[in-house]
Amino acid sequence: MSIRVQKTFEALFELEEIRGIFRDSLPTGLSAEEEAAFRQRIGNLKAIVADLEAGTGTPKVTKIAGTLDVRSREEQYINIHPIQAAGRLTTEARKAIISYGDGYSTCDACRKPFRLDKISKPGIAEFHADLAKWLNMDHARVVPGARRGFQAVTGTLVNKGDSVIVSALAHYTEFLSVENAGGVIKEVPLNAKNIVTGEATAQKIEEVKTETGKLPVLVMIDHFDYQFANEHEIREIGKVAHQYDIPFLYNGAYTVGVQPVDGKKIGADFVVGSGHKSMASVAPSGVLATTKEWAPKALRTTAIVGDLTKRKFGIKEVELLGCTLMGGTLLSMIASFPAVKERVLHWDEQVKRSNYFIDRLLKISGSRVLSEYPRRHTLTKVDTTGSFDTVAKTHKRRGFYFSDELSSRGIVGEFAGATRTWKLNTYGLSEKQVHYLADAFTEIAEKFELPVTK
């Protein structure tokens, strides 16, 4: 680890030790013993900051709680991990975690009606309203990941034996959410370009109707899938669903938070997004948004009454099991939200950089793109069987040589040892970082005498 990065972490950790002194003290101030400990820690901090400024010193803290490594990949490397890119916390989110990391930190000023989305301090109620408006939906809730959004919708709409339409590239959590509700998965086949079309969706609905004698109860399709990150005919699919009067769930796990999403324009009855995948938030976090039509069902409140105590639980929402994100997860999402709203306006720039890198990769003979091309997303599946894998076949490190070469150039996030088909994501990289990334791949190719087109 770079000594300056190391010392930055040590300074942060030392400040937390100082913070602990205040937490253990009385409201009236520090005792003499605590004051001495405080001054000792301040001295330590000054020494760390001096090392940080000079770029000198040796590592003093290498583990957290004795077992956890200090995670510094975002500070030290260009990270192209396929699912980590858009979940990197903003500076404001990291500050929020420092301040709101305690368990029920959202609940300091919780008052009647005792529900998360009604809390005004901090501004959680306002955030929920802003979130719905931003997605052009009528209501929004935060959930522990997109998967819990799927689960809330399937729990509302799906009964045992009901059919649910999904993509042939659907994520496993979509499958599990249907299974959990007792439903049956019906997959829409892909066309030759690995795209789900509106026409194919209509055909699948007709097949289900013929086979079962009734229509599917839900159409749940990804805008961009997780395997290829291909863009599917989401608006056409929404229109088809409505023609059959079937509710449509728009899976925006790879869009909400990185590109503009207009739920009503898309024709979505439900919009589901991932906070930790695409909204610069701590995991597990996500969003579920819906319309006025479906809110009374999907966001229905409890009606159950205890037989002995006659207890009732007010306006807690059944499918969400009441309050959802009660601490740092939600506050990180709120803190990142201004930056997230701004960055979606620059999606085209991110896609342009993705295409720059892919264009450079394709100049290395034998490299292919398995995703649609030109790219419409920053997540891409590539095939380097004809390029970097030819080296792996005879290299003593096999495919791990490629990881070694990337790591030595400050690049991480590829699937270690993979030199055939693998995925990467350039989201959030600056222009100079994308150029550096492309140059690094070219350098590795040239080092091992792979043909490169200039």
UniProtKB/Swiss-Prot annotation:
<comment type="subunit">
    <text>Homodimer. Interacts with SepRS.</text>
</comment>
<protein>
    <recommendedName>
        <fullName>O-phospho-L-seryl-tRNA:Cys-tRNA synthase 2</fullName>
        <ecNumber>2.5.1.73</ecNumber>
    </recommendedName>
</protein>
<dbReference type="InterPro" id="IPR008829">
    <property type="entry name" value="SepSecS/SepCysS"/>
</dbReference>
<feature type="binding site">
    <location>
        <begin position="274"/>
        <end position="276"/>
    </location>
    <ligand>
        <name>pyridoxal 5'-phosphate</name>
    </ligand>
</feature>
<dbReference type="InterPro" id="IPR013375">
    <property type="entry name" value="Sep_Cys-tRNA_synth_arc"/>
</dbReference>
<dbReference type="Pfam" id="PF05889">
    <property type="entry name" value="SepSecS"/>
</dbReference>
<comment type="similarity">
    <text>Belongs to the SepCysS family.</text>
</comment>
<feature type="binding site">
    <location>
        <begin position="146"/>
        <end position="147"/>
    </location>
    <ligand>
        <name>pyridoxal 5'-phosphate</name>
    </ligand>
</feature>
<comment type="function">
    <text>Converts O-phospho-L-seryl-tRNA(Cys) (Sep-tRNA(Cys)) to L-cysteinyl-tRNA(Cys) (Cys-tRNA(Cys)).</text>
</comment>
<feature type="binding site">
    <location>
        <position position="251"/>
    </location>
    <ligand>
        <name>pyridoxal 5'-phosphate</name>
    </ligand>
</feature>
<keyword id="KW-0808">Transferase</keyword>
<dbReference type="InterPro" id="IPR015421">
    <property type="entry name" value="PyrdxlP-dep_Trfase_major"/>
</dbReference>
<dbReference type="GO" id="GO:0043766">
    <property type="term" value="F:Sep-tRNA:Cys-tRNA synthase activity"/>
</dbReference>
<keyword id="KW-0648">Protein biosynthesis</keyword>
<keyword id="KW-0663">Pyridoxal phosphate</keyword>
<dbReference type="GO" id="GO:0006412">
    <property type="term" value="P:translation"/>
</dbReference>
<feature type="modified residue" description="N6-(pyridoxal phosphate)lysine">
    <location>
        <position position="277"/>
    </location>
</feature>
<dbReference type="InterPro" id="IPR015422">
    <property type="entry name" value="PyrdxlP-dep_Trfase_small"/>
</dbReference>
<dbReference type="InterPro" id="IPR015424">
    <property type="entry name" value="PyrdxlP-dep_Trfase"/>
</dbReference>
